[in-house]
């Protein structure tokens, strides 16, 4: 089925985080919620939870009773120029090329209003900017993926969702019938595997 709309994940699809700054924020946030100091035991516990929650930090805090957008709000307090860097330098150019062919949108567990401009990406390029707070539950819950279909006003099979984590991105997207693409790795679970970001343009151009 022809692709008529492309939706993107953000973290480790469009941009990666500064590991040191990100680690500091996630451990301190976890310690704050639990009322415990940051120590090696807490860090190990967090990393175990990260695996159990399919690499979704938002879902960890959601499971601890925080609202769906709580982790996004913590991330939004940081300087995006220090927190994020593009996965590939030509991503803004490629996004512009894709949007000349089909609409593009973004679904992320974090708020992107400040992060995107810091990376040379204009929020106005995207038809929709969907957050986990808007969806109701963070990924990997399917809520946001059903919302993608609603917002796109298309059949699920006409929408391509691109992300980097099988359990958090690919499987819930497939659950609602979206076409799926995994980036920077390969997986038989996804309909497409992209070695580099520009490969997405090649697919949409067909």
Tell where the protein language model's regions lie, with residue ranges.
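N-terminal helical cap/lid subdomain that shapes the substrate entry/recognition surface
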Residues: 2-92, 111-114
